[in-house]
Amino acid sequence: AGDAAVGEKIAKAKCTACHDLNKGGPIKVGPPLFGVFGRTTGTFAGYSYSPGYTVMGQKGHTWDDNALKAYLLDPKGYVQAKSGDPKANSKMIFRLEKDDDVANVIAYLHTMK
């Protein structure tokens, strides 16, 4: 299990360029991350998703620990695999390199309910 306090520092340093972390926060380059766990992929109201995310949601994909871990390590590859579209793209070009960083960010995201 990750360390939420460390994850918060990573999220604020790395994720906030494109995502808001606050409840009711605005849409930025990406959708807000508050309450992401259990959210059906591609469904945040008002955000214009790439088609791969919409297809994932239509297939019933939701964000959980395993999904976020794989996604944060390789966003584009994950969307391609889960959407079934080898040409699917993602605006999220950033990725986390270390498993510990991923675990810590996931632990932090769990605190945002």
Swiss-Prot record:
The keyword Electron transport applies. SUPFAM superfamilies: Cytochrome c (SSF46626). One of its GO terms (biological process) is photosynthesis. The keyword Iron applies. It comes from the Bacteria. Cytochrome c2 is found mainly in purple, non-sulfur, photosynthetic bacteria where it functions as the electron donor to the oxidized bacteriochlorophyll in the photophosphorylation pathway. However, it may also have a role in the respiratory chain and is found in some non-photosynthetic bacteria. Heme c binds at C15, C18, H19, M92. It holds the Pfam family Cytochrom_C. GO terms for molecular function: electron transfer activity; heme binding; metal ion binding. Belongs to the cytochrome c family. Binds 1 heme c group covalently per subunit. Keywords: Electron transport, Heme, Iron, Metal-binding, Photosynthesis, Transport. This is Cytochrome c2.
